[in-house]
């Protein structure tokens, strides 16, 4: 039996790509009109702390004071999400069934996300996913965020397990880097916005192409 299976949220359990991209578009139109980064550049920030991503993007677009501008952009971004969150997200098909099966087998499950607790919990509650998780770590809970391992280490601490006994499952390179840094086994899912080649370069321990394969992970990675 696995000691702990930890999941990223956005792009792994819940499809939030449209919400995130539209939030960025609205925010840049308000603060840096005509300078919206490419979809590829925006997707590359997925999985990171939003404040850090906005600072980096603002600097790349020539902002004279990226720190101050990013703070203003953050307010606009979150205002948009509050208004449109529930209508622009959906669960990935098969995710609820996979979580239910793992939970029924007695595996302990957790969520580790760079998302603020309010929005993260709302997304899980909308699709009745929260009941499967024994532990959750949100942006608000730590001072350093993925790809730093702190959020994953905090989840292991709360669960009372050694990090090496845990698996971290995510859709981004930042997830894989964070998991490896935390000495956890890592799994990349292929139904998110990242290309397979990009994820392969991060060297996860396993890759899965459909949620049904998640149920096989404890056996596949020989976790006891």
Task: For the regions a language model picked out, list residue spans one by one.
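Asp-based, Mg2+/Mn2+-dependent phosphohydrolase catalytic module
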Residues: 1-3, 64, 100-103, 117, ...
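N-terminal helical cap/lid subdomain that shapes the substrate entry/recognition surface
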Residues: 2-97, 105
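Conserved phosphate-coupling serine/threonine residues in phosphotransfer and NTP-handling enzymes
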Residues: 12, 113-115
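Low-complexity, intrinsically disordered short peptide segments enriched in small/polar/basic residues
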Residues: 17, 108-109, 173, 212
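Short, flexible loop segments at the rims of nucleotide/cofactor-binding pockets, characterized by
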Residues: 85-90, 114, 185-186
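Residue-level marker of regulatory loop/turn positions in helix-turn-helix DNA-binding domains and
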Residues: 91, 112, 144
